[in-house]
Amino acid sequence: PQYLKESRAIPLPLKKINAKNWLEVTQHYRRLFTLEIQFRRFYVDYFLKVLGEQKKFYAECECYRQGQRTGIADNAMKIGGRWCFVEVKLNIHTEPHLHNQLKKYCQVEKTALDKERSAEQEKLWQNSVLVIDTTDFYFYDALTDNLIFLKNLDEVCTEEDIKTLREKIIPLLQ
């Protein structure tokens, strides 16, 4: 097709991304990630280390309700004194069943944070999931089944902006 003939590849400078420059480098290239794993590794992982109360966060967290696995959340991070699940997408507008997926991470009895560590119900936010895509950051409220826009990532230019976002999120958690 003609549009392919006229297109040009733009190399992503992934090798240049590190803990000191990730936000500056990815700000320009963030929307060009074509794989969720790229977006996670080169943006979200750094983002969560700043957003959370501790740098440690967990990936691929199995959620359980009544002894049955309900789903696997992309991440769990500590915020507001408890673990909160984070779902990562390239574009939430291409996810027709996103709300159903997010509900699987709510009202859970426990989560396997990794192979050795788990968190019980009282250490988990029960009705809240954070959602990030290459454009925006959202808060999912399971009680109202609403996905609430919090921030356009173009407005997140410094780590201080992320810390300010944390303070906006904490009162919403339930």
Write out the residue ranges for each language-model feature.
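A short, conserved, highly charged catalytic patch centered on acidic carboxylates
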Residues: 1-128, 136-173
